[in-house]
Swiss-Prot record:
The gene is RPS4. GO terms for biological process: ribosomal small subunit biogenesis. InterPro entries: Ribosomal_uS4, S4_RNA-bd, S4_RNA-bd_sf. Its main location: mitochondrion. Residues 105-179 form the S4 RNA-binding domain. SMART domains: S4 (SM00363). Belongs to the universal ribosomal protein uS4 family. Keywords: Mitochondrion, Ribonucleoprotein, Ribosomal protein, RNA-binding, rRNA-binding. Disulfide bonds: none annotated. PANTHER family: 30S 40S RIBOSOMAL PROTEIN, SMALL RIBOSOMAL SUBUNIT PROTEIN US4M. This is Small ribosomal subunit protein uS4m.
Length: 362
């Protein structure tokens, strides 16, 4: 009996070793950004920090070292199994920015920045299952460092499914949450649907055709095409800059706010009401390591209110993405390279279902 209990205890202790690393993460890897264990660690770290500040047991020197250890643990939660000794390697280091930029060149992190996948555990799972290629070769190392000019692609059998999932999530996130959610207060019959109804509609061909025929989306598309023409006249070729945030999301929101602002001004002119000259909300971000603080104004229907926004950005990598294939080319530094001959740049012109079944560019 004692021997049987001992064997059962040994099997329980060694049970995690039988599974892969992705299976050790509790919860649904595909839908959660942090697992239950990771959230518990973060909660304990926050409670520990508050208790130290309240009791004032340690001196300021020990408190700062403890906060540094906290930040390394939080970084390891995001970037995976991160060795803490690597953070403290070298006494001449004055900043952690080069270290963070080095972490941003990892294969799993770049897949997340590309918005090919939603979470880093999801990216690690695909890499470990050998589904993603670098320069047409299979890579199964999650912390693989990508160099300048590397081409990221999926296998042929997995590329079509992955491309459809990316496009559907892209349209759900932009059109349902960002655009349609803003226009629900307008008396338009088409937009007065609940969020779940739009999620179900965008999965079908009928919903995509209904969205393509909308006058609002056609106006938004024409304004963005005019912007592209002006950009090509200035710089000579189409270029897309994607960093830690999705640049096209910001661009669509900016055009949306601009169109709403212009329609508001037209209504005020028709009513012969005195209007204030207020510029629309525009965020100007520079490509330096620490971008300058920018100014923005309030919405047109409010009083003029000037706010100062302080922003710190890390321009780590610039990517040229094709969401139809899907493929991407990695470029580091402030300059974006030229588009290769075998990749067509489809930044916003993603594929939607149409009547002929091949799709229609939006």
């Amino acid at each position: 009996m004692w021997l049987l209990k001992k064997l059962i205890q040994r099997d329980i202790d060694l049970s995690p070793l039988r599974f892969q690393t992705c299976r050790l993460l509790l919860g649904n890897v595909w839908n959660r950004e942090l697992t239950i264990i990771q959230r518990r660690i973060l909660r304990r770290l926050r409670n520990r920090k508050r208790s130290i500040k309240k009791r004032k047991i340690y001196s300021k020197k020990y408190l700062t070292s403890y906060i540094q250890l906290q930040t390394t643990r939080k970084l390891s939660l995001f970037y995976g199994d991160l060795p803490i000794t690597e953070m403290h390697r070298g006494t001449k280091r004055t900043s952690y920015i080069p270290f963070l930029l080095n972490l941003e060149t990892r294969f799993d992190v770049i897949l997340l920045r590309l918005h090919f996948l939603e979470t880093i555990p999801q990216a690690r799972q695909l890499i470990s299952h050998r589904r993603v290629c670098v320069n047409k070769g299979m890579v199964s190392i999650t912390h693989f460092k990508l160099s300048h000019g590397d081409i990221i692609s999926f296998q042929e059998n997995n590329a079509i499914i992955r491309g459809e999932e990316i496009r559907r999530s892209f349209y759900k996130e932009i059109l349902v949450e960002k655009i349609i959610g803003k226009l629900l207060h307008q008396p338009l019959r088409m937009w007065r649907r609940s969020k779940t109804e739009w999620f179900h509609l965008l999965k079908t061909k009928r919903g995509c055709r209904l969205l393509l025929k909308s006058r609002f989306l056609q106006q938004l598309r024409s304004s963005m095409q005019e912007e592209d023409l002006e950009r090509t006249k200035k710089f000579g070729s189409e270029k897309v800059c994607l960093g830690s945030s999705f640049a096209e999301h910001k661009r669509m929101k900016r055009n949306l706010l601009k169109s709403l602002f212009l329609s508001k001004r037209r209504k005020d002119k028709n009513l012969n009401l005195p209007t204030r000259t207020i510029s629309p909300i525009v965020y100007n971000s520079s490509l330096s390591l620490y971008s300058n603080s920018t100014y923005c104004f309030a919405s047109p229907h409010k009083l003029t209110m000037k706010r100062r926004i302080k922003r710190i950005e890390l321009p780590t990598h610039y990517l040229e993405v094709n969401y139809r294939t899907p493929k991407a080319v990695v470029f580091y530094g402030p300059n974006i390279g030229h588009i290769p001959h075998d990749i067509r740049l489809k930044d916003l012109n993603l594929l939607l279902w149409s009547r002929n079944g091949r799709g229609q560019n939006i």
